[in-house]
Amino acid sequence: MDQTLSNFGTVFVFLVLGIVFVVGGYLTARMLRPSRPNEEKLSTYECGEPAVGSAWVKFNIRFYVVALIFIIFDVEVVFLYPWATVFKQLGMFALVEVLIFAGILVLGLVYAWVKGDLDWVRPTPNIPKMPELPKRHSSGRSNG
């Protein structure tokens, strides 16, 4: 019990020191740096070239979907690495657990693939058009 508290205490101390280090560095830099904003400093910087257009560019939503899928599988690798280092000690039960974990992620990938989220150019849907009604011809008489 004391060993567990000691381990958590170590993690807590490192967490607090990390937060103090980041906040302290931020506050120190904010107090010591000069703040002289002008028009040139507040303008958009594009590699030394004059800015063209707005800085707000619309990106295709497909970039977001691809990035999310990449992050999901990147995190999967992060979870698999510790398992792979102790695989022989954990035995068959851990192998089954990892296969279930990977299977769930593969099912998610297949679902995204079947749904068409991985297709960059989506086919346009074939929407049937309404048939045109025959035009009525007036008999030349007016209703007035």
From Swiss-Prot:
Its EC number is 7.1.1.-. It comes from the Bacteria. It catalyses: a quinone + NADH + 5 H(+)(in) = a quinol + NAD(+) + 4 H(+)(out). The keyword Transmembrane helix applies. The chain crosses the membrane at residues 8-28, 63-83, 90-110. It holds the Pfam family Oxidored_q4. Keywords: Cell inner membrane, Cell membrane, Membrane, NAD, Quinone, Translocase, Transmembrane, Transmembrane helix, Transport. It is a multi-pass membrane protein. GO terms for molecular function: NADH dehydrogenase (ubiquinone) activity; NADH:ubiquinone reductase (non-electrogenic) activity; quinone binding. InterPro entries: NAD(P)H_OxRDtase_bac/plastid, NADH_UbQ/plastoQ_OxRdtase_su3, NDAH_ubi_oxred_su3_sf. It is an enzyme of class 7 (translocase). One of its GO terms (cellular component) is plasma membrane. It is found in: Cell inner membrane. NDH-1 shuttles electrons from NADH, via FMN and iron-sulfur (Fe-S) centers, to quinones in the respiratory chain. The immediate electron acceptor for the enzyme in this species is believed to be a menaquinone. Couples the redox reaction to proton translocation (for every two electrons transferred, four hydrogen ions are translocated across the cytoplasmic membrane), and thus conserves the redox energy in a proton gradient. Belongs to the complex I subunit 3 family. NDH-1 is composed of 14 different subunits. Subunits NuoA, H, J, K, L, M, N constitute the membrane sector of the complex. This is NADH-quinone oxidoreductase subunit A. It comes from Chlorobaculum parvum (strain DSM 263 / NCIMB 8327) (Chlorobium vibrioforme subsp. thiosulfatophilum).
